[in-house]
A protein has these predicted regions:
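Residue-level detector of intrinsically disordered terminal segments
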Residues: 1, 69-71
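N-terminal acidic leader/helix
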Residues: 1-32
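Short, charge-rich amphipathic interface segments used for partner binding and complex assembly
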Residues: 28-69
């Protein structure tokens, strides 16, 4: 189970990814942002948050829309 702080991190990452996508940022810029988020929290968070962040990364790689419902 994710803590409230971890949910905030995930929600903020998803919002930023969707914003970058709306602004037509390059896929590799978005991937760099997600990778930096993963690096920042990697040693200090639950496995569930890491799994969700890697799922976000995978959706960016595949070019799919990142859904807000992922956090549930």
């Amino acid at each position: 189970m994710m803590t409230s702080a971890e949910r905030v991190v995930l929600r903020a990452t998803i919002r930023r990814v969707n914003h970058y996508r709306e602004q037509k940022f390059d896929k590799y810029v978005i991937l760099e942002y997600v990778d930096s988020s993963i690096r920042k929290v990697r040693n200090h968070c639950s496995d569930e948050l890491l799994r969700c962040l890697f799922d976000v990364r995978q959706q960016v790689v595949l070019g799919k829309e990142v859904q807000e419902e992922m956090e549930k």
